[in-house]
């Protein structure tokens, strides 16, 4: 055999299956600043050692396959393979452990969340040797972060565009979410905006259905925006949902929104997909549109504690892909959300640098290297009695969104909006005066009721409403 045709097999290639840990478990490895780091919650099948399971995750999410192949000899596995570099037990869980995996940056296409997730949370989640697998956190290195545009505008630019400072923004999702005609929908938008809200919102499943085509909705909502702006002297917006069946149609809807001169559009980033979302985010930056992101489908992925992907990972992915707002739970409303865990990923959305803090579920220090921040949106089962807690939990850089908590007011949409605005202004003023919202919240709301009949009526309607259910996805060590 000539040297030109010599194969790996002829110089010692050995076919067959070998244990993953022989190649992919490397506890001596020192991580690099350019590595993408992942923390997986691994539940191996009975009889599978933790080291083998962790190595299997590293292999199947990077360069490995189920058997040895001769083409391994045509590249440098040592350069490209993922490495399980540390394993630790999970408190209170005998069958689970956390496996830390480092991925070389060269494994990923620049500026592509789609490609990053295809590797890290791809086929490995169906691997038979694992009973369950969950991605708890990712460390995105600055070298990779810098390949993304990120949010179209970010928190400070949004405040400058809207001329709104020193308080959370107020929103409302129009209800019923499906079934209204475009004209009646626009009327509901107008009533909410003139009552004092900053934004109204399409529900996530409002796209372009037979009862209300998208173009008609956009036109009537634009009319509502301009009319309410003229009456109040404040800049208003409505999240026009541009989500569509194709990227081309999505961009067409965003173009029409820009032509109408409205300030913001919306996208369902998980059902629409990261490729579509990044495309829309780029269009929004180039054309001066803010981008509101809904997380429909997230609970399919993130709610179960032992399998899937934690929302903090989806939040980081959204900041890379692009969005100026994203729904982030409420802690106090009808939807799932542990307080410390929620505050952890809220910081990951807003702040430029976030230290590792396992008490809040943050496994890695994250440096965003000046990537614009994202406003967290608190939405789902909240009303005026929640306003002190929401203001205290989320702070000024947030959007507090009341759907039923606005439209369910006994006097109508505009009085419902007035009630929310009065409650918010009262809470912000009390906080600025040094009062403790966590302790005095109810008293602050009762005081405001004395000079706002709209707020008093809202407080009477919702005084007994509670959503007292335990959180499913708790941090480790919590009972």
From Swiss-Prot:
GO terms for molecular function: magnesium ion binding; monooxygenase activity; ribulose-bisphosphate carboxylase activity. InterPro entries: RuBisCO, RuBisCo_large_chain_AS, RuBisCO_lsu_C, RuBisCO_lsu_C_sf, RuBisCO_lsu_fd_N, RuBisCO_lsu_N_sf, RuBisCO_lsuI. Binds 1 Mg(2+) ion per subunit. Its cofactor is Mg(2+). Residues 1-2 form a propeptide. The modification Phosphothreonine is found at residue 330. CDD domains: RuBisCO_large_I (cd08212). The keyword Metal-binding applies. The disulfide bond which can form in the large chain dimeric partners within the hexadecamer appears to be associated with oxidative stress and protein turnover. It is found in: Plastid, Chloroplast. One of its GO terms (cellular component) is chloroplast. The record marks 334 as: Transition state stabilizer. Its main location: plastid. Substrate binds at residues 123, 173, 177, 295, 327, 379. Keywords: Calvin cycle, Carbon dioxide fixation, Chloroplast, Disulfide bond, Lyase, Magnesium, Metal-binding, Monooxygenase, Oxidoreductase, Phosphoprotein, Photorespiration, Photosynthesis, Plastid. The keyword Transmembrane helix does not apply. PANTHER family: RIBULOSE BISPHOSPHATE CARBOXYLASE, RIBULOSE BISPHOSPHATE CARBOXYLASE LARGE CHAIN. Heterohexadecamer of 8 large chains and 8 small chains; disulfide-linked. The disulfide link is formed within the large subunit homodimers. This is Ribulose bisphosphate carboxylase large chain. The gene is rbcL.
């Amino acid at each position: 055999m000539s040297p030109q045709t010599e194969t790996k097999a002829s110089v010692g290639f050995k076919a067959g299956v070998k244990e993953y840990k022989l190649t992919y478990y490397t506890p001596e490895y020192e991580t690099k600043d350019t590595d993408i780091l992942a923390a997986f919650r691994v539940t191996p099948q009975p009889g599978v050692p933790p080291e083998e399971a962790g190595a299997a995750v590293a292999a199947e999410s990077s360069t490995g396959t189920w058997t040895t192949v001769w083409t391994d000899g045509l590249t440098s596995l040592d350069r490209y393979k993922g490495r399980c570099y540390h394993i630790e037990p999970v408190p209170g869980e005998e069958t689970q452990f956390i496996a830390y995996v480092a991925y070389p940056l060269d494994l990923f296409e620049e500026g592509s969340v789609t490609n990053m997730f295809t590797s890290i949370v791809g086929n490995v989640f169906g691997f038979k040797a694992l009973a369950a697998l969950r991605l708890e956190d990712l460390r995105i290195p600055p070298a990779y972060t810098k390949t993304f545009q990120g949010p179209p505008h970010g928190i400070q630019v949004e405040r400058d565009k809207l001329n709104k400072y020193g308080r959370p923004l107020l929103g409302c999702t129009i209800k019923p979410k499906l079934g209204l005609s475009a004209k009646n929908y626009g009327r509901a938008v107008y009533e909410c905006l003139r009552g004092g809200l900053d934004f109204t919102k399409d529900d996530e499943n409002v796209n372009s259905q037979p009862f209300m085509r998208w173009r008609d909705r956009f036109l009537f909502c634009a009319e509502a925006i301009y009319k309410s702006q003229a009456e109040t002297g404040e800049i208003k917006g409505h999240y026009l949902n541009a989500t569509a069946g194709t990227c081309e149609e999505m961009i067409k809807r965003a173009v029409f929104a820009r032509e109408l001169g409205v300030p913001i559009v919306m996208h369902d980033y998980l059902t629409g997909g990261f490729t579509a979302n990044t495309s829309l985010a780029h269009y929004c930056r180039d054309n001066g549109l803010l981008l509101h992101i809904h997380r429909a489908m997230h609970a399919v992925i993130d709610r179960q504690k032992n399998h899937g992907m934690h929302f903090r990972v989806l939040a980081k992915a959204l900041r890379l892909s692009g969005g100026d707002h994203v729904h982030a739970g409420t802690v106090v409303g009808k939807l799932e959300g542990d307080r410390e865990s929620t505050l952890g990923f809220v910081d990951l959305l807003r702040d430029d640098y976030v230290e590792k803090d396992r008490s809040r579920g943050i496994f890695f220090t994250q440096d965003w290297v000046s990537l614009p921040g994202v406003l967290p949106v608190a939405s789902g089962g909240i009303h005026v009695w929640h306003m002190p807690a929401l203001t205290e939990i989320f702070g000024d850089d947030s959007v507090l969104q009341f759907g039923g908590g606005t439209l369910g007011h006994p006097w109508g949409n505009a009085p419902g909006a007035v009630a929310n605005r009065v409650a918010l202004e009262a809470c912000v003023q009390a906080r600025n005066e040094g009062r403790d919202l966590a302790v005095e919240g109810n008293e602050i709301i009762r005081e405001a009721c004395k000079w706002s009949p709209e707020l008093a009526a809202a407080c009477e309607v919702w005084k007994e409403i509670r959503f007292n259910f335990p959180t499913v996805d708790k941090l480790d060590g919590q009972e």
